[in-house]
UniProtKB/Swiss-Prot annotation:
One of its GO terms (biological process) is phosphate-containing compound metabolic process. Mg(2+) 2 binds at D105. The gene is IPP. This is Soluble inorganic pyrophosphatase. It is an enzyme of class 3 (hydrolase). Substrate binds at K64, R78, Y90, Y174. Its cofactor is Mg(2+).
Length: 214
């Protein structure tokens, strides 16, 4: 057989599929469960004063993201019906539990928007009592502990009246076009916020103990 015939014959033969990397095969056969931000992320050694926050909603966003409690992923709940946007980054404190069976909500004041699903260290400076459609839905007001412009704040009384009014009016108005009633009361100090976080930590611990006993 001539060299030209050999070349033509080899070209006609089907190419063999490359072998998959053994590491890929190994990882596919032994898949591990993905970490859940609510249960697997630690709250932090300095809680309830300084604690981790998982960001769900970016500052300036009109999209209402929220934690999908089953998968641990951040899902789109809805787009806000009004023209307002979230004034600051919004998320939750891991390993906490409130009476509504959700983790503790937090609004984090800082300079920049943060990508949903990331986490940061925050310091509680106050609490905003809120009733959402007849149910208690208080919000912790916090500052990013690693933002040089905000980390020196220790109590909500140190914020300007305009900033407080901005936060209050957002939560009062953001559901009006959905015909849902939200009532916001006067802001409470950092000591009250820390007590609320500690209570939610204790409630979460009780929930875990009950789950283990079942």
């Amino acid at each position: 057989m001539s060299e030209e015939d050999k070349t033509a014959a080899s070209a006609e033969q089907p190419k063999r599929a490359p072998k998959l990397n053994e590491r890929i095969l190994s990882s596919l056969s032994r898949r591990s469960v993905a970490a859940h931000p609510w249960h697997d992320l630690e709250i932090g050694p300095d809680a309830p004063a300084v604690f981790n926050v998982v960001v769900e909603i970016t500052k300036g966003s009109k999209v209402k993201y929220e934690l999908d409690k089953k998968t641990g992923l951040i899902k789109v709940d809805r787009v806000l019906y009004s023209s307002v946007v979230y004034p600051h980054n919004y998320g939750f404190v891991p390993r906490t539990l409130c009476e509504d069976n959700d983790p503790m909500d937090v609004l984090v004041l800082m300079q920049e928007p943060v990508v949903p699903g990331s986490f940061l260290r925050a310091r509680a400076i106050g609490l905003m009592p809120m009733i959402d459609q007849g149910e208690k839905d208080d919000k912790i007001i916090a500052v990013c502990a690693d933002d040089p412009e905000y980390r020196h704040y220790n109590d909500i009384s140190e914020l300007s009246p305009h900033r407080l009014q901005e936060i209050k009016r957002f939560f009062e108005d953001y559901k009006k076009n959905e015909n849902k009633e939200v009532a916001v009361d006067a802001f409470l100090p950092a000591t009250t916020a820390r007590e609320a976080i500690q209570y939610s930590m204790d409630l979460y611990a009780q929930y875990i103990l009950q789950s283990l006993r079942q």
